[in-house]
Amino acid sequence: MTDQGEPEVVGPNEGATIEGPVGGPLTFKARGEQTNGTFTALENVIPPGQGPPLHLHANDDEAWYLFEGELRFKLDGELRAAPRGSFVFVPRGTPHCFQNVAEKPARILVMFTPAGMERFFDQFASLSTPDPAAFAKIGKPLGMNVLGPPLAQSDPR
């Protein structure tokens, strides 16, 4: 392996899959160990109506590409629609959350840079009964601060 990591192709239905924090499967496509710590990439399926609480990442930039479905984002206080095919970028320190507003699951590619957020997802998936308080407790040591409730509660449609 070089200092930069090794070239790799991760095909459809490949990668370690765990239960995501808002329900639905989360599949790692690239972890920090594979990318020399430069980024984490994962595919996530978001059930209808679901999404994380309002939060920010002090240490990570985050980006999404929406393969299927429709999400609604709250980005630094502004509500924005993200239909299928949308790309969303959120710089570190920006308050954000999202919600699947479609009647079917949404499928997204999520990237964090630098790598490290995979630790949050691994720890959350290991809980026997995940709850909203665990989201904040696990995220805080990783620089993720929960600021408010999910969009379904703060800004219902």
Which residues are covered by each model-predicted region?
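A short, N-terminal "cap"/entry segment at the start of jelly-roll beta-barrel domains
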Residues: 1-39, 126-157
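Short acidic-glycine-tyrosine-enriched beta hairpin
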Residues: 10-11, 70, 77-95
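Short strand-coil-strand connectors
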Residues: 22, 74-76
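Conserved hydrophobic/aromatic beta-strand scaffold that supports enzyme active sites
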Residues: 28, 41-45, 63, 79, ...
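Short histidine-centered beta-strand/loop micro-motifs
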Residues: 30-31, 53-58, 99-101
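Ligand-binding loop in jelly-roll beta-barrel domains
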Residues: 35, 72, 92-118
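Short, conserved beta-strand element in jelly-roll/cupin
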Residues: 41-47, 56-74, 111
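Hydrophobic small-molecule pocket/channel-lining residues, especially in calycin-type beta-barrels
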Residues: 50, 58, 71, 87-89, ...
